[in-house]
Amino acid sequence: MAVPLPNDSSNAAFSWFTEYQRSCILENGVVPEWFHGIISRKAAEEMLMCKPAGYFLIRVSESRVGYTLSYRAEDRCRHFMINVLPDNQFMIVGEKTVYCSLHDLVAFHRRCPILPYNELLTVACEQGGKTNYVELLFPQKKDVSHRQVEWISSSTATNTLQSNISEENQTSQLQNNSTSHPGRLYPSLETEVSALNIQSTDQPTKPVPKPRTVFASKTPAEETPPQLPPRMRLPSRLQTSTEDRSQGLMPVIPDRQQITPNTPNEGRTQQKNQQQKPVVMSLVHIKKKLKKKRSEDHTYEEIAGGLFQKDATSALESINTNVEGLVENDYQELAEHPISDGIPKSSDRNLPVEYRHPPPFAPGY
């Protein structure tokens, strides 16, 4: 059974919640949307009547120790009391199921309806802008803010006192300097120099920057064109004989050993002349070579034709002599039925040389 609260119910509910139930509501440091703190029954109905059926909230009861579940039905708002058991468990009055936390109770009745009306909890009713749970869940915020304000005010007061003291010290020093020489109309250089020296010793010295070297840019008129480097002399090749050059066996190449020109213009003209000469000479030599090749080909054909005729006649004579010797010394036994082996017979002497038997001393026989 729930214990009723005394006459001063708001303070009793506040002390009970802060001592026993604060850690049960917070889940991972987050306040659930359905928790609305200490609010009255009328305020809960005003919040739920403008919502559709199934909206709900849980509030701290004002008249007893425990919570109250308020939700919107189809035609009205219904309220169910939630008892807090000694082992810090929760149970709706009229039911037998026990829940370990209010989060479990809400999750269960989102799936299973509340008896005897068979109505489910759908959406948590959010607070409209008034946070009724701040005083319950964060009661030390006010004290902390007051302490912070006191500490800030004390720190500002000490800072102002220190600044006033420093200003008074500076003014007193100036007054002492002025009173030390009351008869002077103009300031003395000695006192000002001493004051500057004192200030320079108090302030940290800054490193003096090193002087920078300035490079003057040259105008384009002053810039002279770079001189061409002298060419390396290549080792002289073996001089070819004049006979080879005349016959066209060796190409005529001008000697590369030349005196280096004194000026870049002379060197360029010499390079152009050297590039043009070999081209002309090479064309002349190509024509000479073509003429010589044609004459040599005709001579080679005449010589080769005579030699070939001589070799052919000698070969035919040797073949004829060998064939005659073979016919005289060759004896063959003829079978009753002659068999054609595809080899020409010795009797066929009228056959050409290609179809006759080769001589015994012929190569490859």
UniProtKB/Swiss-Prot annotation:
Pfam families: SH2. The keyword tRNA processing does not apply. SMART domains: SH2. One of its GO terms (cellular component) is cytoplasm. The keyword Hydrolase does not apply. May be an adapter protein involved in tyrosine kinase signaling. This is Hematopoietic SH2 domain-containing protein homolog. It comes from Danio rerio. The gene is hsh2d.
